[in-house]
């Protein structure tokens, strides 16, 4: 029982307290009867696939793998992991299997609109909800370190 609680604590510290996996966790929690069951399974998955000391990019890959192993729908799992990854990683390296879909026209329009005010911008198409999200890494939340994000819905 103590080892189980230690595993949940480790998962809470790594994945929940950082806030960097918010969308993935919200979706993952729906796949289990209790959030603690999800977190326990996640940390067990991490340990059995190379350990819990993970780089940011590798931790997003682990999250994706665990979501899929837990019965997640591929399109939705890809969506939430990609959203979390691009919200918090200005380098924008996506986990293996997650396809980058740059939205060049929307990025150029955004840069024209905010000419000289922003430089580090990424516009990405998200097929799950048919949206383009523009991430501005020049402007991050001082507490959460979350990039500013504007959502544009495709018609």
Where are these regions (language model features)?
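Acidic/histidine-rich catalytic neighborhood
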Residues: 1
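Conserved, mostly hydrophobic/aromatic
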Residues: 5
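Radical SAM enzyme core and accessory elements
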Residues: 11-155
